């Protein structure tokens, strides 16, 4: 799973 911060979209 790619690193997704809190402001990251669920597209990853």
UniProtKB/Swiss-Prot annotation:
Tissue specificity field: Expressed by the venom duct.
Modification Phenylalanine amide occurs at: 12
PTM: Both amidated and non-amidated conorfamides As1 are found in the venom. Amidation is important since amidated peptide is more active.
Principal subcellular localisation of the protein: secreted
Single annotated GO MF: acetylcholine receptor inhibitor activity
Intracellular or extracellular location(s): Secreted
Name of the protein this chain belongs to: Conorfamide-As1
Lineage: Eukaryota, Metazoa, Spiralia, Lophotrochozoa, Mollusca
